[in-house]
């Protein structure tokens, strides 16, 4: 799926640059370098991989691929232990603590994240070089993570968003799009929160007139909600996303 989207977006960029000019088309990417999937990988490495093995892996050429294996192993381990109430709660607390460290940018898991994140970046660059694909701007999920929550709070204070059962978002039931949840009742954000902030940055940083998202069809409802929210917040460009 990732390779299909990569080929599709690169083809679109090349075609549009031939039609409209190199300088009028801006290519961007949005790698997910934080989130539960990252926390699971870090959790498994810290709890189930020896320092010796980690050091050996850190010097190996396939260390990027190894991280993918660690995520899969961590996911399976957590699923196996989910049936044990005490262990489930303990693991849940540890994952929450990991995500908190990444958000605060401090702690042993943040240090581990910085090192292993670079492995992933190196692998991505290697793949992109092989595929002859490049981007004008890399937006990182970690770059918009905390800022996205503050942006939603700001719009809520301005009266542009609404609260429902402690959560913040917008109700688009009349458009058959349901409720676009932007902040959960515990104050944490979601993918829509980050996509809202990402779009805001692209609109304001590049003053773009049209934004094309190359994503899976299964994300159609999600992005319809995000674009509708952006329109509501005054971003007219969202009508042409």
Regions flagged by a language model, labelled:
Residues 1-241:
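NTP-dependent nucleotidyl-transfer catalytic core
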């Amino acid at each position: 799926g990732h390779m299909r989207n990569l080929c599709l977006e690169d083809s679109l960029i090349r075609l549009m640059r031939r039609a409209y000019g190199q300088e009028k088309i801006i290519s961007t990417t949005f790698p997910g370098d934080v989130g539960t999937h990252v926390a699971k990988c870090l959790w498994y490495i810290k709890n189930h991989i020896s320092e010796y093995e980690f050091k050996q892996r850190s010097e190996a050429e396939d260390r990027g691929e190894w991280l993918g294996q660690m995520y899969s192993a961590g996911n399976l381990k957590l699923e196996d232990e989910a049936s044990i109430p005490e262990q489930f709660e303990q693991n849940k607390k540890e994952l929450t603590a990991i995500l908190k460290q990444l958000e605060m940018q401090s702690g042993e898991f943040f240090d581990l994240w910085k090192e292993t994140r670079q492995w992933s970046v190196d692998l991505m660059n290697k793949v992109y070089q092989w595929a002859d694909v490049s981007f004008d701007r890399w937006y990182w999920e970690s770059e918009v993570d905390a800022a996205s929550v503050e942006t939603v709070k700001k719009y809520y204070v301005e009266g542009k968003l609404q609260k429902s059962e402690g959560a913040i978002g917008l109700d688009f039931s009349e458009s058959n799009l349901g409720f676009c949840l932007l902040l959960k009742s515990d104050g944490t954000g979601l993918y829509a929160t980050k996509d809202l902030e990402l779009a805001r940055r692209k609109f304001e940083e590049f003053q773009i007139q049209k934004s094309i998202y190359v994503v899976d069809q299964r994300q159609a409802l999600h992005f319809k909600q995000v674009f509708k929210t952006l329109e509501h917040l005054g971003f007219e460009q969202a009508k042409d996303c």
